[in-house]
Structures are given as structure tokens and as C-alpha cells.
Amino acid sequence: MAEEVEIISAEDVKPGEIAKKMTFGGEEFEVLFAKGNPGKTREELEEIKRKAAESGGASDAEMVATMGYCAPYNPHTYLTELQDVICERDQACTLRDGTVIYADIYRPITTEKIPVICVFAPFGKNPSEGMDSWQLMGVPPKTVSQYAKFEAPDPGYWCRQGYAVANVDPRGVGNSQGDVYLWGSQDAEDGYDFIEWVTAQDWCNGKATMIGNSGVCMAHWRIAATRPPHLACIAAWEGQGDLYRESYFCGGIPNPDYETHIIDALAVNNYIEDTPEMMKKYPLMNSYYKDKIVDWNKIRIPAYVTAGWVHHHLRGAFEGFRRIRSPKKWMRAHRDFEWPDSYKPENLEDVKRFFDRYCKGIHNGWEMTPRVRIDVMDGYEFDYASARPEETFPLKRTEYKKLYLNAADGSASFENPATEAEVVYDPKTETTTFTYQFTEDTEITGFMKLHLNVECRGYDNMDLFPWVIKLDKDGNYVPIRVMGAPYRGAWGFLRCSHRDLDLKYASDFQPVHSHEKEERMQPGEIVPVDVEFYPHSRFWHKGEQLQVVIAGRFIKTEWFHDTDMNHQTDNGDGMHVIHTGGEHDSYLQIPVVPPKYQVGDYVYRG
């Protein structure tokens, strides 16, 4: 937890910024804060909406601008258009240090004491007016009520199920006092205080839960780790748990533009933690970034976790499911994008059973739900298996096999080539590929690892952006189609100077890197590296091909990559070299999942 802070004068503070002296893990840091965007006025919002209508749709900048709208402070209670639901607007909660934050609380008109769903994230407690087609992308109009805010539960649904919904503006957001601290111990501590305050209200049964996806879930993971006594359970849907490894520096490669995109979208009257500038100031892992890692061991409450196979929150979701200490935890890994998945009726009914069990004490058979349910993707919009029940993840019957790469002909096989070879490519403009054709039906579900022997000619560093994609028997690309757009498949990242492994967390199937030191490459040096892949689940039919694609830059193909993937590479003018065969065995380790049952030609996969 951060200690008491003081504003200081630092040499690298830009105009309009302040620096605060803060302590994390016994280390003292100068943390930079930028002056926030106060949010759009009603008039500015209407002008943005008018221009968007004239041009046939809102641009990314216009959509972000509408997200930054903050309604004027106006505490009152009113009857919503839902008729049987009231909203208590701008309810004040005083935190332990005296800071006041505000929440909008929706609740059904009833004399029965009810549980509360808390939503704690910096995106604002108000529904983002004018953003319907963006914030609910992939969700048909009128699926949710006008009271649903960004990436959060819909009061129009949950209040009618006997729950209150409390949308919170955290410290520094909107009209709440203080400065914004993004996804660290201060944010988590404030969430603890709010939960204990709201569950003490006379209309509450003393139990709270949390649900929301993406940035909302990221905040909720951290709050759950503080163990509020009245937090009964959590539905952690699509949230990262390690900001350094999963957002700021994927594989050690900085991605500050996405953080700028997030900051620009928030309505902040005071100051906000300037994470893009902090990334420049502290490029290596330290206690500042460790403060933004969820302490999974402290989460002991029942948890319903979801992970989308095609989204950048994937790693954090599985890390959370695997590492929390709760004996009551469930995972649903699906092929949808996060937003439509969150509002599908069958998924709402599913999580309602979970909430009813642990927030209302209803014995509804929830414990019979399979601990793990996975979609196994095939091609385009089709799945080989949907919601297949499993016991754990990685799957117990997983068999790890190595596909050895051959630079001589661009092939891959289960035997290491005896002869050494190399392939050279320009990281700025070219890629290199290695292809294997399956001789039998094969399911790959779990963690892949790419082990390479690499050399950089003409520079002392190299960034690797590998993908694993699917081709048909004739070599034609077979994408996964998500919301109408093609998606390639499994991916990984690594800056080779960050190749050092974190031996506390790394395993044979998941090479977790420490990022605590930089090891530049020497001329002529061939360096072994292991690239961590995000989890994946896909089926290859006999005759189809698996192709490893390696690039020196992130190649954008999906629509959402425009906002979340814009890495700052460090390849210089060097040429990348992949060595294979002999003593320089390079391979892709794949998690092959055999059938659950097989007799002769009969195969059952579940």
C-alpha cells in the first residue's frame, strides 16, 4: 500500500504536471501526475453528437470525448423510467482519509433488504450518453436500459432481480475529491471503504458483490484482494491482473499510447497518475509496478471468472482463476468479444444463479456447475466445442509436444533437424514463417511456448511478435471471426533484452519474465529466448496446417488493435536471425489435448 504522499519538485516534471513522493514495497518513488480533463459540458456533448450524426458515425476521438462527460453535481433521489426502480444520485461516501467520493445507487422499490452490486472503475458512474453504439459494440440496440454504464451491469436487469447497483466515481473521477490513482493499492483501499459503507445502509442485507468487464474488473480484482468483510463473492469478467506484463510493457515492449487513450477518456477535475510518463521514467519492473499486481493469494471468496480467447485481458483472467486461493471458483472461457458476452441473456441468467447462491443464500444447485467451461474454436464463426465441461485449467490430460522449426525450408516437425540453418528477415517490413501439416485431428488448448535461438545483426536488441495461425490443407488462411472481423489466433511478445525469467512464477509451459534487468545482445551472439503466449484453444482437422508467424512489429489486422496495440519497438536498423536445428533447436511447444475417450475409430472429446 502507498504511504502518505507529499508533492515535491522533480527535474523531469513537465509543465502542467506535479510529482508526488510515494513509497511502495519499501522503495521511494517520484510519481508523476498530469492535470486531468474536466470532462465535456452538456453543450459540447450535444455538438459532438450532432457532428457524428452528420458524418454518418462517430470517430474514435469523438467517442472518447463523449465518454469523458461528467454530469453536474446534483444529489437527489428520483423515480427512473423503469418505474419500480429509484436512483439515489451523488450519494457521498467518506473514505478513511476524509476524501469524499460519490456514487449513483439504483435499487428496486421494496421493503426487503437486498444485496448490492458495486461497480468501481474510473470510467465514470453516469451512462455515457451518445455512446450507445460504441460502448455496447456487438450488443443490439435496446438490449440494455439507458441506465447501463460502460462495461458495467445494467440496473434495468439487476434491480428487477432483487439487487441494488452502486456505480461509483472513484477518487478523483468526476465530482469525487482527490487525484486519480490508477489500479493500485490506493484504488483498492478506497474500494474496500466503499463496500463497507454501502453494505451498512439500512436497505442492504449486508452483502455486496462486484461484476463488470475490462477496466471495471481490473479494479474489482484489486479490491477483492483487500478482503472487505462484507464482499460475499465476485464475478471477475475479462480483467488484467498485472499491468506491467499485460498492458504497459507486454513482453517488455512499451505500449504507452493505449494508456494515453485511457487517460484521455476520463473526466478528471484534479490530477491523474500519468502512467505513460511513468513508463518512460521507469522502464523496468519495480515496486511501483508491483503495487499494480493483484495479490491473488488474498482472494478467498467465491469467484466466477470469464476469459475471451481473442482479447488482451485473457492472460489476467487465467492468472486470476489459477492463482486465487478460493476453493469455490469457476471459469468460463469463450470465443466472444467481452461486451456482447457480458449482456447475453444466458450469461446473465448464469451469473444470477451465482449471485443468488452467495449473496442471498439460495440453494439453487450452483455448485453443480462445471468448474471450467471452454469453447474450442475452429474456423471463422464456428466452434468445435461450446461450453465443454472440464475440471481445471490447464486441462489435466494435456500432453506437451514440441514442433521443431526448420529455417532451411520454413517447415516444422516433431523431430529436431540434425542440420543447423538460419533465416534472416527485416523486422520493419518482413516476417518469417514455419508451417506444420497435421496428420490427424488435433486439439490445442492451454499455454504455448516459443523457444528460439536468435541473433541480431547490426543492432543490440530485437523485439519479437509471434502468432500461431491456422491454414487449410491448401495453405489458405483460416481466421477466427469475431463480431464480423477476422482474428488470427494465439499471440505472444518479447523484447529479447528482457529474456531473463522470473523463476518464482515461470514454469515449463509458461515462461514468465522478470523484466527487472536489461541484457543487450552482443555482435555475433546467439541468444536462447522463451516467448510466453497467451492461452489459446483451437481445433485443427487432419490435413489443416499450423503456421508460426514471427515479426519484429505488431501487425494490426483486427479493428480493436487501433486502440490497444501500438508498441514502441526497439529494433534499430538490425536484421533479425532465427537459428534452428542441431544445438540451436528452436521450437513451438504446444498443449495437445487428447480425446476424453477413444475406442478404435470412435473418438469422444466431450
Annotate the PLM regions:
Residues 1-3, 100-107, 113-122, 225, ...:
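Hydrophobic, aliphatic-enriched repeat segments that assemble into extended interaction scaffolds
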Residues 35, 39, 112, 129, ...:
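A generic structural signal for solvent-exposed, polar alpha-helical segments
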